[in-house]
């Protein structure tokens, strides 16, 4: 059994059904090993076509099975610190504010960021935190 836990980004969340590892991830989600931030939940709500769809998504799996990690002042401070370190290297306009907050949440909570977003790789190169890229099948052309 693994002690590893993940923090899912929206980039991975929307591609879960396209993953050849969907069954593995579903099992991990059911076991409470895949967490989500309030920020990612807001992104999901923003993408919903209407309130009814948003409410349904939040009350059904996979979202309903994911423990929520909320922002703290320490997380916000770390996100700002990482943004400043990225600015020192001229890369501060790459990662979005949600990406910085999600990465800081994962780093300070001991979670691995599950993503399909190169900006998390850039952040991890700086912070040394764990990330995992979701394996998925790209959409057919």
From Swiss-Prot:
CC cofactor: Mg(2+)
Top-level class of the enzyme under EC nomenclature: hydrolase
Record HAMAP family: VapC_Nob1
Protein residues bound to Mg(2+): 99, 117, 119
Chain ranges of the PINc domain: 7-129
The protein's Enzyme Commission number: 3.1.-.-
Protein name (Swiss-Prot/TrEMBL): Ribonuclease VapC2
Organism superkingdom: Bacteria
UniProt keyword Hydrolase, yes or no: yes
Protein source organism: Mycobacterium tuberculosis (strain ATCC 25618 / H37Rv)
UniProt record similarity statement: Belongs to the PINc/VapC protein family.
Cofactor note: Binds 1 Mg(2+) ion per monomer; in the crystal structure only 1 toxin is bound to Mg(2+).
PANTHER family (UniProt xref): RIBONUCLEASE VAPC2
SUPFAM superfamilies on file: PIN domain-like
Gene name linked to the record: vapC2
GO molecular function term, any single one: RNA endonuclease activity
Keyword Lyase carried by entry: no
């Amino acid at each position: 059994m693994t002690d590893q836990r993940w923090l899912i980004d929206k980039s991975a969340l929307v591609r879960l059904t396209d993953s050849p590892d969907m069954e593995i991830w579903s099992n991990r989600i059911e076991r409470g090993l895949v967490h989500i931030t309030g920020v990612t939940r807001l992104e999901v709500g923003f993408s919903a076509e209407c309130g009814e769809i948003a409410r349904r998504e939040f009350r059904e799996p996979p979202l309903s099975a994911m423990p929520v990690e909320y922002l703290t002042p320490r997380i916000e401070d770390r996100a700002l610190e990482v943004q400043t370190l990225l600015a020192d290297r001229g890369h501060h306009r790459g990662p979005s504010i949600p990406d910085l907050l999600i990465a800081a949440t994962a780093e300070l909570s001991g979670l691995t960021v599950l993503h399909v977003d190169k900006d998390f790789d850039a952040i991890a190169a700086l912070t040394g935190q764990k990330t995992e890229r979701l394996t998925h099948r790209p959409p057919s052309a």
